[in-house]
Amino acid sequence: MAGALVRKAADYVRSKDFRDYLMSTHFWGPVANWGLPIAAINDMKKSPEIISGRMTFALCCYSLTFMRFAYKVQPRNWLLFACHATNEVAQLIQGGRLIKHEMTKTASA
């Protein structure tokens, strides 16, 4: 069973359809876009003082918009959808960190 699945996957990777997909914007666009969520995830280790509320809000709106686009475009671009879903979650976490930081700052003042 597993051998047949591996063989089928290997055949697909060798196919012209897969090569065409690798050479399309449906692949390279999302690959380039992965820099945003990777940077947001990396910034979670840094102090919340560096978080820009306006930029976090803008990136949340951007990711929501392009999640919808990735779902509506035909054929559906699941790689782009996953990229923006990851970025949306990362930005919401960053926004939560900023709100918590601001609340503790005003409570201690």
UniProtKB/Swiss-Prot annotation:
Transmembrane regions listed in the UniProt entry: 21-41, 53-71
Keyword Mitochondrion on entry: yes
GO CC terms, sorted: inner mitochondrial membrane protein complex; mitochondrial inner membrane; mitochondrion
Molecular function GO labels: pyruvate transmembrane transporter activity
One Pfam family in the UniProt entry: MPC
N-acetylalanine modified-residue sites: A2
Subcellular compartments: Mitochondrion inner membrane
Membrane topology: Multi-pass membrane protein
GO annotation, biological process: mitochondrial pyruvate transmembrane transport
Keyword tags: Acetylation, Disease variant, Membrane, Mitochondrion, Mitochondrion inner membrane, Transmembrane, Transmembrane helix, Transport
Modified residues (N6-acetyllysine): K72
Catalytic activity annotation: pyruvate(out) + H(+)(out) = pyruvate(in) + H(+)(in)
Membrane side Mitochondrial intermembrane: residue ranges: 42-52
Topology feature Mitochondrial matrix, residues: 2-20, 72-109
Described function: Mediates the uptake of pyruvate into mitochondria.
Family statement: Belongs to the mitochondrial pyruvate carrier (MPC) (TC 2.A.105) family.
Subunit structure: Homodimer. Forms heterodimer with MPC2. The heterodimer is the more stable and dominant form.
Name of the protein in question: Mitochondrial pyruvate carrier 1
Source organism per UniProt: Homo sapiens (Human)
